[in-house]
From Swiss-Prot:
Species per Swiss-Prot/TrEMBL record: Shewanella baltica (strain OS185)
Family: Belongs to the HflD family.
Localisation per UniProt entry: Cytoplasm; Cell inner membrane
Protein's recorded name: High frequency lysogenization protein HflD homolog
Membrane topology according to the record: Peripheral membrane protein
Gene3D superfamilies tied to this protein: HflD-like
GO cellular component, one term: plasma membrane
């Protein structure tokens, strides 16, 4: 397989995985801690030797690959909500990479979280609150806010709101990586078959 396409597809799976977790949280108010940790940990890997270093939990990433098959493949069951969130994340990512001050602040704040992890787990409420505030302070104001749909009772809970923002930050991290690896929106239209084929092969590795 083309190594660049494999890496790019891995990063794209990371975006969809985090977005799907946002959707699940918004609807149900809960998310498996291991799955949450797997996505949040990607935020902290800022200087990886290779793409695989960003995604340590390969089992969780399988869900992202399956979402690629569903969203870009021939399935008639495409999730329009996932697509809407994806469009929002990619739009904010473009704004972020054009903002030198935003990128600088983001790196500084992520370093603070890394220091916080000397004392707390990444799924600790204090760490999640910190990650959520990074999204609110730096990302959210760059462009139109992503409107999250779900169960109003769940969405009113502060911890659910914070986890959703933290996961949107994780989706942004994968979006930045995807773009760094040469990912472009037009690939999602004109190179869909290659992306889907790569996702299928990655599922069997």
């Amino acid at each position: 397989m083309n190594e660049q396409l494999v890496n790019r597809t891995m990063a794209f799976a990371g975006i969809l995985q985090a977005i799907a977790q946002v959707q699940h949280l918004a609807r149900h108010g809960e998310l498996d801690n291991a799955e949450l940790a797997a996505s949040l940990n990607t935020i902290l890997v800022t200087n990886p030797d290779n793409t695989a270093d960003v995604y340590q939990d390969k089992i969780v990433l399988q869900k992202g690959y399956k979402l690629i098959l569903n969203q870009l493949g021939d399935s008639s069951q495409k999730d329009v909500e996932i697509t809407r969130y994806l469009v929002g994340v990619l739009a904010l990512e473009r704004k972020l990479v054009r903002s030198n001050s935003g990128l600088g602040m983001l790196a500084e704040r992520i370093n603070q979280v890394n220091r916080q992890l000397h004392h707390f787990a990444i799924t600790d409420e204090q760490v999640i609150a910190n990650l959520a505030s990074i999204y609110s302070d730096i990302i959210s104001n760059l462009g139109p806010k992503i409107q999250i749909s779900g169960n109003p009772v769940c969405l009113q809970r502060p911890i659910v709101q914070q986890k959703i923002r933290a996961l949107l930050l994780a989706a942004m991290r994968s979006a930045v990586l995807w773009r760094q690896l040469g990912g472009k929106r037009r690939h999602l239209v004109f190179a869909r078959k290659a992306i889907v084929d790569t996702a299928k092969k990655s599922l069997t590795l």
